[in-house]
Amino acid sequence: IGFLDDYLKLRAKRIAQEKGVEYKKSDSDGLAGRFKIFGQIVLGIIVGATLYFNDSVVVKREVVRADETAALPVFDREGKSIKYDSVTIDGKKRYYVSAKNVITTIPFVKSHEFNYAKLLPKSLESFTYILYIIIVIFIVTAVSNGANITDGLDGLATGVSAVIGIGLGIFAYVSGNIRLADYLNIMYIPNLGELSIFIAAFVGACIGFLWYNAYPAQVFMGDTGSLMLGGIIAALAFLIRKELLIPIFCGVFLVEVLSVTLQVSYFKYTKRKYGAGKRIFLMSPLHHHYQKKGYH
């Protein structure tokens, strides 16, 4: 999506140069906003459907056995017996089963867990996948657009994404280690430690790019890079089951989006009421407000 948008903009610039006329940047040169949103929705559907329907995307749930010699009465949706793993932690044997569910991490509550199925009546819990995919679409679209809006100053989106990646990488590593997950009382997700390798590469790529993208920037990522950064961060958050922590992780993205929303809404409201639009910030997104004040 971002690549096609950037390509169309560069193509319009090249055509203007070939005609010998001054190029004036315009939003109409790239993809229309509705096409960008459509592409992000399609991406959200793919990510959500993969996470929900792929049998390898599971979490480990601890089960208690009163009798070590008795068979463990755990069954899946089809009534088949589920295998369990036994792990010795601090000299005590613990038993875990792989569970396919839509449980995620929710901050600042005692259990640290939340099941999306609880948002629906019991009679409609079989349609949880629809609700889950809608949530994925919303978050993927919001985060990718947030990263895109943040990419307005040299090194801003790249630096913020690197910091977010470090936080997600730590969560991925501890969530994939059964002993650390048990000690920290967080959700254990098997094989998630391998994801930390990808996240390390992601952070390294951001830092490497930042070397050339820091002020004064020599290289720009455009929509190709910023939309990709947001999409990767959103997908990683869902894989780690930490998507409800995104307002904390992606606080800068959130503030940037809110600044644009407030600016546009307030301008339209005051123009309709007083005949002349007023602004909250000197310019939005927020980083341009501080740039106008000379803080850059």
Task: Please give the residue ranges for each predicted region.
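Alpha-helical transmembrane segments
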Residues: 1-3, 7, 12-15, 34-104, ...
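A broad, structure-centric signal for solvent-exposed, well-ordered loop/edge residues
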Residues: 17, 45, 113-115
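N-terminal TM1-TM2 helical hairpin plus the immediately adjacent luminal interfacial "cap"
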Residues: 99-117
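Generic secondary-structure transition motif, activating predominantly at the C-termini of alpha-helices
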Residues: 110, 114, 121-122, 266, ...
